[in-house]
Swiss-Prot record:
<keyword id="KW-0793">Thylakoid</keyword>
<dbReference type="Pfam" id="PF05151">
    <property type="entry name" value="PsbM"/>
</dbReference>
<comment type="similarity">
    <text>Belongs to the PsbM family.</text>
</comment>
<keyword id="KW-0812">Transmembrane</keyword>
<dbReference type="GO" id="GO:0009523">
    <property type="term" value="C:photosystem II"/>
</dbReference>
<comment type="subunit">
    <text>PSII is composed of 1 copy each of membrane proteins PsbA, PsbB, PsbC, PsbD, PsbE, PsbF, PsbH, PsbI, PsbJ, PsbK, PsbL, PsbM, PsbT, PsbX, PsbY, PsbZ, Psb30/Ycf12, peripheral proteins PsbO, CyanoQ (PsbQ), PsbU, PsbV and a large number of cofactors. It forms dimeric complexes.</text>
</comment>
<protein>
    <recommendedName>
        <fullName>Photosystem II reaction center protein M</fullName>
    </recommendedName>
</protein>
<keyword id="KW-0604">Photosystem II</keyword>
<keyword id="KW-0472">Membrane</keyword>
<keyword id="KW-0674">Reaction center</keyword>
<keyword id="KW-1133">Transmembrane helix</keyword>
<keyword id="KW-0602">Photosynthesis</keyword>
<dbReference type="GO" id="GO:0031676">
    <property type="term" value="C:plasma membrane-derived thylakoid membrane"/>
</dbReference>
<dbReference type="InterPro" id="IPR007826">
    <property type="entry name" value="PSII_PsbM"/>
</dbReference>
<feature type="transmembrane region" description="Helical">
    <location>
        <begin position="7"/>
        <end position="27"/>
    </location>
</feature>
<comment type="function">
    <text>One of the components of the core complex of photosystem II (PSII). PSII is a light-driven water:plastoquinone oxidoreductase that uses light energy to abstract electrons from H(2)O, generating O(2) and a proton gradient subsequently used for ATP formation. It consists of a core antenna complex that captures photons, and an electron transfer chain that converts photonic excitation into a charge separation. This subunit is found at the monomer-monomer interface.</text>
</comment>
<dbReference type="InterPro" id="IPR037269">
    <property type="entry name" value="PSII_PsbM_sf"/>
</dbReference>
Length: 35
């Protein structure tokens, strides 16, 4: 299965961006409930 660099980067960003976004939301809400 051949994957060009642009498609590979796009796939990584497509997975990474929502994951980071959810992590930030999770950490923020957890800090609010702890304090």
């Amino acid at each position: 299965m051949e994957v060009n660099d642009l498609g590979f980067i796009a796939t990584i960003l497509f997975v990474l961006v929502p994951t980071v976004f959810l992590l930030i939301l999770y950490i923020q809400t957890r800090e609010e409930t702890e304090s």
